[in-house]
C-alpha cells in the first residue's frame, strides 16, 4: 500500500450531496490522510479501505452550531449520541467556556485556567468529533467582577479586553454570550461591544443567547444588531424562538427584522433546534435582581419575607406565560426527598405539595443545589416551521452528548441531544417537505461552517477536510422523545472525522480522531 496513488479510504457508489444545496449526483470520494483528494469515478483507484455507500447519501459531516459536549468529551470522548446523528464538529461556548477562569475557581475536568489549556488537553486526549470553542462572554466578567450587578470600571474593562485577546490568540473562534444567566445578564451592551471588538480584530464571530425571547425579543435583537454594527463582527442568534403563548405567531415579524438588519449590511443570522420546547435551569424564571450574587444568594433571598413575596409574584407571571403543562421538571440536585418530583409537571408537583405553583417552585429552589433542570413547553410548532424555512437559518442542537451512565439511569433530558439532525432531515425535509434534503444538508454544513468561520470544512470538495457522513435518505429519522429521550436515531451508517471512520456500518470504531479547531487568531501552530 505504499503506492502514492493509493487512497487511505474510498467511499464508493454514493449519491453525493456536496453541501452547496445542489442536487445529488453519483460518484466516489477519495481520502488520503485527513483530506479529500478526489471526487468522481474512482473505480480504478486502489484504496486501503472502502465504504460502499450504495443507495445512500454521502455528505459533509454535520456542524452543530450549539453543543454542550465539550467537557463531556474529556470523560467520555466517544460521544456516541452525537456521532450517530452525523455530527462531526460541535461549536460550544454559550455564555461560559471551560476557560479562562480564576485560579481559585478551577475544577478538574470542568474548568481550566485558560481556554488554551482546555483545547490542548482536548487535543492530547482526542475525541470522536471536533470542537470549535467560543470564549464565553461570562468568563472575563466573572474573573474580574464576579457575580455582582455593576458596570466595570475603565481598568476592569481593560482587563476583560486583555483576557479576551488572550483567548482569541489561544484559539477561540469568537465570543459566545448567554444574557439570561448570571453574571452575563448584568453585562452592558457597551461591555459586549468592547470584547467583541477584540474578537473581531482576529476574525472572530459573536454568537448570542439574546436577553429575551418573548415580550422583549425586539429590543434583544436590536442589542445583538448594535453589537454587530459597532464591533464590525458577524452575529448569530442562538436557538431563535418565540417563548410564551402570548407571543406565538410573531416569527414572520422576527425573521423580517433580522432580514432588515442583513439588508442594512449587518452580517446577521440565526440557528434553531427542531423542537417546540426548550430546556434550561429553573432559575431562569427568577427575576434578575433576585439572582445577583449567584444561586446561593438567591436561596438566601427566599428566606426574606419581603423578597420572597416579590419573587412569588414574578414566578406567578412566568407560570401564566407558559400555560398549563408548560413546565416539566427533569432533574433535581442534592435533595433525595425531592427526587419523586423529577419527570413531573409543576402543576402536578404543586398538587402533591398541596400548594400553589409559585410556592412549589420556591420549595424546589430552596432545596436543590444547583437549580433544578426543566423543559419549557412554551414554543409554537408553527413558529418552529416558519423559522426553519428562512434560508439563512442553520441548526444548533443546544444539547450535550449524554453519557452511557445517563442513558443507563434514564436521566431525563431534552431529545434534541440525541435527535436534532436526523429530525431535520427525516421529519422536516423528507416528510414535511419544508425544503429538500440537499438544502437541509447545506444548512448543517457549508452554511454552518461559514457562520463559525471554519475553513476547509462543510463541503465535499478536493482539498477540504474529510469530515463526512453517509446516511439513508429514505430512513433517516429521530427516535428520541420527551418520554424516552435516549433512543438513538436511525439512518446514519458511517461517519468519518478528519479522514478516520468513527462509525462504520452502524458500529462505533472506538477511534478518536477529533481535535480542536482553532480560530484565525491562534498564535501557535496553525490547525485546520
Each model region followed by its residue ranges:
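Histidine-rich, glycine-flanked metal-binding segment
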Residues: 2-9, 16-61, 76, 478
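Short, acidic/polar
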Residues: 74-79, 156-166, 220
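Metal-associated gating/positioning segment near the N- to mid-region
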Residues: 44-45, 50-117
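C-terminal cap of metal-dependent C-N hydrolases
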Residues: 304, 386-392, 397-398, 413, ...
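Active-site neighborhoods of metal-dependent hydrolases
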Residues: 122, 128-154, 160-181, 196, ...
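Divalent metal-coordination and catalytic microenvironments
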Residues: 14, 29, 34, 55, ...
